[in-house]
Amino acid sequence: MALRFPRFSQGLAQDPTTRRIWFGIATAHDFESHDDITEERLYQNIFASHFGQLAIIFLWTSGNLFHVAWQGNFESWVQDPLHVRPIAHAIWDPHFGQPAVEAFTRGGAPGPVNIAYSGVYQWWYTIGLRTNEDLYTGALFLLFLSAISLIGGWLHLQPKWKPSVSWFKNAESRLNHHLSGLFGVSSLAWTGHLVHVAIPASRGEYVRWNNFLDVLPHPQGLGPLFSGQWNLYAQNPDSSSHLFGTSQGAGTAILTLLGGFHPQTQSLWLTDMAHHHLAIAFIFLIAGHMYRTNFGIGHSIKDLLEAHTPPGGRLGRGHKGLYDTINNSLHFQLGLALACLGVITSLVAQHMYSLPAYAFIAQDFTTQAASYTHHQYIAGFIMTGAFAHGAIFFIRDYNPEQNEDNVLARMLDHKEAIISHLSWASLFLGFHTLGLYVHNDVMLAFGTPEKQILIEPIFAQWIQSAHGKTLYGFDVLLSSTSGPAFNAGRSIWLPGWLSAVNENSNSLFLTIGPGDFLVHHAIALGLHTTTLILVKGALDARGSKLMPDKKDFGYSFPCDGPGRGGTCDISAWDAFYLAVFWMLNTIGWVTFYWHWKHITLWQGNVSQFNESSTYLMGWLRDYLWLNSSQLINGYNPFGMNSLSVWAWMFLFGHLVWATGFMFLISWRGYWQGLIETLAWAHERTPLANLIRWRDKPVALSIVQARLVGLAHFSVGYIFTYAAFLIASTSGKFG
């Protein structure tokens, strides 16, 4: 008999129902559960798949470069970045009528095009690319890297080139390689690119391979490096009247500490960024030589962890046993990696707008909004994934004997205290924040707006003042001209920083008031509740009071049969599932806040946010309804415009989102009954009954239906907000 899907599980392959297909898809990437899997094959498969992942990433980025070079307007955008709309790619759509063709023909293009809101134009411009030829060269190079990655993946699946398990578990060598080889060397290489290509380009000098060795990045060459006069590299920086991309007002410095923003581009100084990357390269190149490998020198991570016993004796055995626990658990390692990456991604969202690194991106408002929202949603999914794999670690990989009385065991021992404190914080934040909002709504509805409870965020204002914002009148740290902190930086980075913090043309330390105070606490509620669900899911993954044997049922299970009460909906997977809803909800509030505050700043009517954000009706009416009115109006038989497709996507997103509820608010028995009825009718209908199926149709399992519902909810939610965000911002600012 021919092998049926899934080949990795003979048990499933012999299942006579459609469960075979869905369970096969669900467990396709759960390598640990496959037939004939060994630890060695598990590690080798994952390692090889990383090369495939890299190939896809390189191919995708190559495609971005290629399509902009082929169909974009990069060269004309470079001439006038503030007024030419960057084109992502052409649209070839047989459904477009004449009005659509006209609506989407923009940016100087001959036919319909999509505008780029990704920020790639600003990025490529900042790093020194200027022509379509540059873009094609980059696309070809990335295509080459993609091919190399595929070859690498194939190579490491061949018997001769398969690494051993001991190679994968050599943590010190891997850390040294990643710290020095990846972070250190790549940061150094990036510094080199900025100094040799990007900074000259910002001063009107075109450096390419043909003149790379002839153009000195600094008039004195390597002299100051070898003579120890490094400060010479910081002398004569670009002036405040410098026109980016030209020699007008340009200096000769390559590594500076100016602080603040380039006045014309409103982005960080390129010479500051080169300096920053050089410092990071230096730190990581040292860090990558700290761990003991072949030469018998340096730290052993295991020794470090074993030696760390907390003083006083009241915190148990500290980190004893952690080295082997982490090193032998891929889920633990993945959980740590995802947690770090999630935090970094959210920080990228925050810093891309507050400290823009790319020239002119701060004045491209739609791109700013899209970038912030994009990175926050990605951070949310990554962070929930971190806790999911933490829970799987506790179920599959945690060994109580190995971790007796260490930090992991103690987390489990006092999980009730952790969970109840998170619960208390969530309840406190929720009731008080909602109470304040609702009180304010009642006051406005009853005609006494002066009775609103409006709380000034004085602690946050004090922190902003400590960083140099003078508006609030606190005389503290950097906003105090007599203090040592102020005087220490006065001759280098401080003037640039202080002018950036105190001028209102950027998003650095925005002025905050009672509306910000309220939404800050609403977001804190969302974050604490999401964390509560995720932490409880992981800490209760092995067992809870109602179900002490939970770990025996695995990561995702619906119930322990109908006869055992209190076992439904409490698997670690269910916690992850619930947390994703809260995560989406929270990031909704975060992005609403960011977008509304910025729209009013960009339009110069910030009082609208300040006055309307203190009560719920204000958010619904003056943010959501006011900014979606064009989308709700949409398209009609008499015409359309370039927002019509966003209006269609806004509608479509709502439909996908609503479809999720069909799976979420229904029971399996209903679907099973429906399927039985349809199958019965099919088998008794002439002609139709000539078509048979090999697999008996059965309803999705409870867990699978939840996943399908969650997927539709998430995708619809994000599609809807993406359409709203891009249309409402580009409709106002282009």
UniProtKB/Swiss-Prot annotation:
**PROSITE patterns assigned:** PHOTOSYSTEM_I_PSAAB (PS00419)
Kindly list the organism's lineage.
Eukaryota, Viridiplantae, Streptophyta, Embryophyta, Tracheophyta
What protein does this entry describe? Photosystem I P700 chlorophyll a apoprotein A2
Amino-acid positions noted as binding chlorophyll a B1 in the UniProt annotation, renumbered to this chain: H654
Pfam families this protein is in? PsaA_PsaB
Q: Which PANTHER family match?
A: OUTER MEMBRANE PROTEIN, OMPA-RELATED, PHOTOSYSTEM I P700 CHLOROPHYLL A APOPROTEIN A1-RELATED
Give, as one word, the top-level EC class: oxidoreductase
Q: Name one GO molecular function term.
A: magnesium ion binding
